[in-house]
Amino acid sequence: MTEHHYDWSGGPAVIKQHSIAKHNVLRAYLARYFITLGCSPNQDVLKLTLVDGFAGGGEYTHSDTKQLVLGSPFICLDAVREAEFALNANRHKPLKLDVHCYFIEKERPAFLYLERALRDRGYGHQIGAEIHLRRANFHDEAENIIDAIRARNPRAGRSIFILDQYGYKNVPFSLIRKIFATLPGAEVVLTFNVDSLLTYVSDGDVTQEMLSNLELNGAFCGRTIEEIKKSERDWRLFIQSGLYRELIQRCGAKHYTPFFIRSPQGHGDYWLVHMSQHHRARDVMTEVHWEIQNHFIHYGGSGLEMFEITGYDPDYDSLAIGQHRLGFEFDDVARKQSIRTLKEQFPRYIYARPDGLSFGELFASTCNGSPASAEIYRSALIALVEERVIEVVSEDGAVRRSASQIRNTDCVRPPAQRSLLIT
């Protein structure tokens, strides 16, 4: 993961705490990803391709602690090694992780530093085999990489594209659409510096041309920027909400979840958007977000459906600042808030389907508009069961009484005697 101002010419580049949050999300997600995919005892091989489109030099120095910090290439490689050990610890039938990694970096100092760091850390023998180094723009290499993934894994094309661009212009949405259209098993983790875009957004011709080139010109539903600024109290959040919805629509993913990361300067939000074609992948990433988040933003305004987003703000990181915030655990507060919101939304959705729907269908059809994980969904449903607003039953008719009992195939439906409060 690299930004243009990082400098590897004299050693590891300097990295700030808010950027390390991206590394933490990636590390935690890869660990869960391998556990999820490698759980079948009958598997022999797990094929996967990891693509780091903006790899950087692989090593950083923390701006505050001065400690050495590993970048995304080594996070990927370490995740593979650790997963292979963990997955085979209690297996009778060995599982081989057949993972290829593509590390693309256009800047010469960063590329040379990464190549040297890989050799110094014992990965030299894999370069040209499982590790593919490319000194190039990601956009120029993407077609060849997509073809190589499809050749290795024709049916699913299982892969994760880590696209930590600087700014918002280096990854065309048309390219992301092609990834999903060509590789059904692909996932994309995209960095999008929304505040950098907001700095320049206006009603001028230059901005409108830029939005058109980014395929974001429909984000504001025909309203001008001047009109939005005059009529919306939180106009920045209102504009971000429109941009996010347009971004998701243009990328072509069925399932997605955003995570914001805030720089210490106040604004400076950028998004880490995970996109996939399967709701299970989305849920795994959401679980990671709930592990790492320490802040919450309500996006939206008049004329837009409200949605919420978890995120990371270094000012709220007790480990980073060395102070504990007594009496306040954000995770518990945000979790309770999400359960309350779901309890308000679920009844009308469920009552509109008199025959009910499966839990899996409920989650898959609504999860994109909520920061909640499947576990939080289950907790909200059980709260409604206890209040006799709904009922959850298994395929054989067993009534579910606790969140841990709910399975994807269970039917969520109105009770035989409906509440008069639902209209």
Describe the residue ranges of each PLM region:
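Class I SAM-dependent methyltransferase Rossmann-like catalytic core
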Residues: T2-V45, T65-K66
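SAM cofactor-binding core of SAM-dependent methyltransferases
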Residues: A31-I145, A372-S379, A383
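Short amphipathic alpha-helix with an adjacent loop that forms part of the alpha/beta core around
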Residues: A142-P154, R177
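A short, conserved alpha-helix within the catalytic core of class I
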Residues: Y168-K178
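Conserved beta-strand signature within the Rossmann-like core of class I S-adenosyl-L-methionine
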Residues: P184-S196
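A conserved mid-domain beta-alpha-beta active-site/ligand-binding segment of alpha/beta enzyme cores
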Residues: V206-P264
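Conserved beta strand-loop-helix elements of the APE1-like EEP
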Residues: W271-R282
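C-terminal target-recognition/interaction regions appended to catalytic cores
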Residues: E287-T423
